[in-house]
């Protein structure tokens, strides 16, 4: 969703609250709970899960390994659920021609750097750069080159843009900022 006028352009960035992240977090949580229950049932000698009789799985070594995988999966799942809860990576890009300032805001992990805020003068922006990496999983990322500060990504690296979409986005950004486009 974008808000745009002649002087101000605000582009909202979607964070980690994507459908794929929800699906992976649920699958990982359920799978790791299954592994942990099988490991615990092999330790107790009872059938906590009716699909696997505890007599078929010995606690040493299969039950220990299943418990380890279950605990590791719970840690990874809790990490995914935390990023979804905190909506890591979400924010906005605000381009203001009237004041001549570009503001980039993103949410990070809790702590000192929870709010990532970058403010740049439009005069310091050298160009809009498209970086294209081909292969089996092609990657197209849009960067804003800033004099003396390097490059700042304007798109997520995991977004799969078609060549037409990335070119259009680069052209819109370059036209609004009145800077050239570079392709690498």
Swiss-Prot record:
Membrane topology, from the record: Multi-pass membrane protein
Keyword terms of this UniProt record: Chloroplast, Membrane, Photosynthesis, Plastid, Thylakoid, Transmembrane, Transmembrane helix
InterPro entries named in the record: PSI_Ycf4_assembly (IPR003359)
Alphabetical GO biological process terms: photosynthesis
UniProt keyword annotation of Transmembrane present: yes
Subcellular location: Plastid, Chloroplast thylakoid membrane
GO cellular component: chloroplast thylakoid membrane; photosystem I
Listed transmembrane segments: 22-42, 64-84
Record's keyword annotation contains Chloroplast: yes
Family annotation (HAMAP family): Ycf4
Membership in a protein family: Belongs to the Ycf4 family.
Functional note: Seems to be required for the assembly of the photosystem I complex.
Protein name: Photosystem I assembly protein Ycf4
